[in-house]
């Protein structure tokens, strides 16, 4: 891969080109080297790869309905050191620097046909998903080289900042690179999206796309249709985005049947019923965006149509949807429930889910447009007083959109929880202009918009009013505060790291 080709993942020779927190991350790579040598009998890594976690500013649970999102990459990442396994061509060895994650040596002679046991959740399933995806992507079914892998990650697990996707993405990058499969960033993102579905999560694509396509100092507006496109969004000056982990675990693959995957199905059923009531070719509809495209509707019209056709009877059973469409329940499930994915619910909330998706998408576009106007204003106006006044108004409007987003996530999409609702309320009461859950929800993190001058006092207040009151002290005992409560800026996407670290 060419480090000078912007379409391909870059090859980075110095860690300070990636990390602001250079010293701590240097120690991570040194530990990775030392541990690798111990595990693999003196063998040295020949490649290093890293892929970041992400935070979504706004646009929750809309990507799998075909709509745009606005994330940026975190500095926190998953890194992997790699060497070739010269002892056995059919075995890959998977280890982690954190002893909590037990190692596995896995026979991969089946290549792309390797089976992943989704009933037994193990962290190596994500690595196998990447292996399966890359193996299937190889031309003419070429056999992948077996490898020794050692991972190190500091993306908080179960926090809604894409630790699992970072693991899939870094594995996809590592395995493809080691097998001379040259893929650009978009292709790697698409392959990672496909691969992560092998572990039983119907991913919408945001997490993998930003992990590969992120750039320093800019958020990305990501559109998925008609093709994957990204647009830089410069964030306003004078404020910080602060991440606070509720410390309620949010594990999509574990709770998907009643949470994440259920919402995917509800959005699909909402789309097909809306298309049916609008007289469209509903048989071809799979996403809410398909209704917009086929009917040539704008978002306000879609919100009105949702009120008109879905609000009277908000909850449906499989049998009721099948009867309306004049198809069997078996055909409904086969067509609109993603294959290989379990959903545990007899009732499906369609009105609330559709209304959230359409209004949340409006907020994404408003948020990015406000940021664009602010950036253009600052570039064309040198009057400091005007700049200051304009920036204050901009920030307040962005905060309002974030608050509206959380309200919709909580009340319409019902992907919040009592701890997240309490935490966002505490954040607003202690200096945040806007605060919302970020990620899948049902636990995990909130993101808050905080004036730079108030960040330190804000973090202290959250410690006092949330962590000290709502979190078991035993849970905090072995965790550094900076790992669950911190401010962040947009960071670099996935890359290859020179073996000379």
From Swiss-Prot:
Residues the record marks as active site: 207
Q: Which pathway is it part of?
A: Carbohydrate metabolism; galactose metabolism
Q: State the signal peptide span.
A: none
Mind listing the GO molecular function terms for this protein? ATP binding; galactokinase activity
Q: Which keywords has UniProt assigned to this entry?
A: ATP-binding, Carbohydrate metabolism, Galactose metabolism, Kinase, Nucleotide-binding, Transferase
Q: Looking at the record's lineage, which domain of life comes first?
A: Eukaryota
Q: Where does ATP bind?
A: 158, 160, 162-163, 250, 252
Q: Which GO terms describe its cellular component?
A: cytosol
Q: Which residues bind alpha-D-galactose?
A: 54, 60-61, 63, 207, 260
Stored Gene3D superfamilies: 1.20.1440.340, 3.30.230.10, 3.30.70.3170
Residue numbers marked as site, Transition state stabilizer: 54
The protein's annotated catalytic reaction(s) are: alpha-D-galactose + ATP = alpha-D-galactose 1-phosphate + ADP + H(+)
User: A GO BP term, please?
Assistant: galactose metabolic process
| E.C. no | 2.7.1.6
Which PANTHER family does this entry report, sorted A to Z? GALACTOKINASE-RELATED, MEVALONATE KINASE/GALACTOKINASE
| Family recorded in the similarity comment | Belongs to the GHMP kinase family. GalK subfamily.
Protein name, please? Galactokinase
Q: Which organism is it from?
A: Dictyostelium discoideum
